[in-house]
Amino acid sequence: MMSQATPSATPVRNADGQKKGKKLPLIVDVAIGNNGKQLYQVHESSKMVRKEMPRSTNFALNDDISDEGFFISQINEQRTPIRKTLGTLSPSSLNQKRIRHDVYDQGDDNSNDDNCQNDVYEQQQQQPQQQQQQQQQLHQPNMYENGNVGVISNDPVSSVGHYDNNPVSHVPTGAYSRVQDTDIWSDDVEEAFEEVLRLIPKSGLNKIKIAGRSCGRNELISDYIFAKTGKFRTRKQVSSHIQVIKNLGQKLDIIQLINDGPIFNSHEEQLESTKKFEDVFSKINLNKSLGFSDSMKRKSDSMPMHLPATKRIRRKHSGNPLNKIKFSNFFMSVNDQYGMNPIVLTIQQNGNDVKSLKLKDNANISSRFPGLSDFKSCPHIPIIHNMVKILLPQLPESYSIDDGFSSSYALKYEEPENASPTHTSIISSSRTYSLFTCVYSYGKEIVKFDEDGIQLNQDREFIPGFWKFFFSTFGDQSEGGLSAAFKGVTIKQILYESSPDSVKKEQDASKVNKSKVKLVLLWEFAKVSECKDALTTTTKLVLPPRASASSSKTTEEVFEYSEPALNSIGGTPTDTTSPNMDLNNQNLSAAATSIPGIRDTIHSASMPDINELPSSAKPQVRLQKTFQSMQHLQPHQMWQQQQQQQPSQGAYTSSVASQSLNTSLSSPYAQYGMPLPQQTIGTFVPPTSQTFGVSYTHNSQHPSANMDLMMLSSMNTGYGNITNNQDYQFGNIGYTEGFTSEF
């Protein structure tokens, strides 16, 4: 006969069976154990106050609760267990079937799962008396330290492990193995809880704003505990713990912090505490927004190697070799006439510690980098963003931008020793690639070109010809004008494999197979006034996935493009009522997949008239016109020099001048009261060979409609190689020949 489990402090009754004095409440918590059996926890009370709350929802202080494989089966499983104290349990709530899966081996502390199960079975068959004694012991209530609260359970005890000197129970499930903290408020969690109470100011019922986000006190406590210990405690757990501390009334200093917040002796202490609070929680909030936390790293010296993590660890598979391409060693500087004592304009800050940033779904980055949204369907292509902060001081006389400018960067790739043929076919340091570069001004394309023979692990210059012109042109501008010029410039570079199979010349010479694109480099710039701020920060961007469009209907789409006009920045805009779409527009459909650019050609891009644009795009166009107006401060001098170098083109110039006079009144320069700049005509083919408004038919059966091809050109290349001309235009400012090779 099993002994009856009786609470340690049963109220005394008189001879008539009545209690002496007022009846005291008896609180019983009911829970389901990990083996599906019911557990009861009895809380006796005095003076209408519960003495202590349960420390865990599954009553883990009853040593450990494990899977059925660890249990010592009862002699008669079909018999309904009888609780002499609390009555009879329903058989339907017992012996619930659980899947024993992924059982964890506890090493020296715990025996092997199979051996443990076999030993228990033999013990059941060979030692029934000892088993009965164990069951009787299990029916005895397990008490807390104060002896007032007991746990009554039918479940046998499994082996117990330890983590950071705290008992840990293993709970096998069908999905994964996990470690369960038997003490929710362990010493490290309690220490972090008390620390954060001394940081958070008391704000009554109002929430605290951190970086524009309203947070409650319990949420801040939860975030701090997770950042400090790596153990997550919910807001409800924090709230319950606060109520327990108040009810117990033992830690008066903590209760005072809960009720009144931290108290300061002087105003300086309050300011220092406020600053510390903002620093700590600003960092926690930033890490929480970016989706990572440095505090989640476990202490390797205190955690045995055989202990599992709280969840099954998802190992990062390095299956994509393109992710191993690193951008490094970037700098821009100006040397003196002897090639010594360089003045550093900017230098890379975090070449070895590049963090990833996932963009939100509503991020409008395509306004700065047209065509970037096409890469949303290509998550395997790495996108590296460089924020370049440039210092441009007043240079001494011995320094010259034209002679002393220097820039360099490298694309590093370490090929593994045992690389598979598939790995080598994707990326290899021994292969040469092509680099497509497109420069934008406030989202409008101004120049683009291709480079061949690009090799990895080699230092190369960063378009020095463009920067020499940029610094020499805008170096004398005001602080605001120079800052606006830097802010408006963005550069997109696409590294792709220039093999015969990469470009579909038989279908369209402007399309490149997406599988041949290896890397995308994005550049943004800003002007700084301090040398310590002249740093370049590198970040790996993760684009939000593109919503898949329905392909049930096959429709024919026609796109049309136009050549830039000779006498106006605005060019000849396409008719807004036409069903055709300008390929120079950045808002192309998913089937078009257009990236502005041109292979083996360099030309200027046209900007539509502001009157033909929707109201939402007009402010950006005004900024573009202001930026281009600054570029035309010296057009007459450069035009006179080019006319002296090109006397043979005088006849063609006169014919263009008459046409320019007719369009000068409608030019955007009239809005700013500026004279119409003279146009260089070296880049343009005579009118007899020019083609305007050329269109082609693009349907869903075209090879580019399956999103496997990417557009590298939005201009017609059927009238010859433009790079053979003597001049070309950059934002409607002409350059002499030889400048092309510098890019």
Swiss-Prot record:
Localization per Swiss-Prot or TrEMBL: Nucleus
Summary of the knockout phenotype: Impairs the formation of germ tubes and true hyphae; and decreases virulence in a mouse model of systemic candidiasis. Leads to defective biofilm under normoxic conditions but not under hypoxic conditions.
GO biological process per UniProt: adhesion of symbiont to host; cell adhesion; filamentous growth; filamentous growth of a population of unicellular organisms; filamentous growth of a population of unicellular organisms in response to biotic stimulus; mating behavior; positive regulation of filamentous growth of a population of unicellular organisms; positive regulation of filamentous growth of a population of unicellular organisms in response to biotic stimulus
Region (Disordered): 1-20, 104-165, 629-657
Induction record: Expression is induced by CPH2 which directly binds to the two sterol regulatory element 1-like elements upstream of TEC1. Expression is also regulated by the histone deacetylase complex HDAC3, as well as by TOR1 and EFG1. Moreover, heat shock factor-type transcriptional regulator SFL1 represses expression whereas SFL2 induces expression. In white cells, is up-regulated in the presence of alpha-pheromone. Expression is induced during oropharyngeal candidiasis (OPC).
Protein name: Transcription activator TEC1
Classification lineage: Eukaryota, Fungi, Dikarya, Ascomycota, Saccharomycotina
Gene: TEC1
Presence of the UniProt keyword Transcription in the record: yes
Residue spans of biased composition, Low complexity class: 113-137, 630-649
Keyword GTP-binding belongs to the record: no
Keywords from the UniProt entry: Cell adhesion, DNA-binding, Nucleus, Transcription, Transcription regulation, Virulence
Family statement drawn from the similarity comment of this UniProt entry: Belongs to the TEC1 family.
Physiological role: Transcription factor which regulates genes involved in hyphal development, cell adhesion, biofilm development, and virulence. Plays a role in the formation of 'finger' morphology, a unique multicellular morphology of C.albicans induced by carbon dioxide. Regulates gene expression during intestinal colonization. Required for the expression of the secreted aspartyl proteinases SAP4, SAP5, and SAP6; but also of BCR1, PGA4, and CDC24.
InterPro entries linked to this entry: TEA/ATTS_dom, TEA/ATTS_sf, TEC1_TEAD_TF
GO cellular component, one term: chromatin
Biased composition (Polar residues): 1-11
Entry-linked SMART domains: TEA (SM00426)
Residue ranges: DNA binding: 178-252
GO MF annotation: an example: sequence-specific DNA binding
Classification via Pfam families: TEA (PF01285)
Chief subcellular location: nucleus
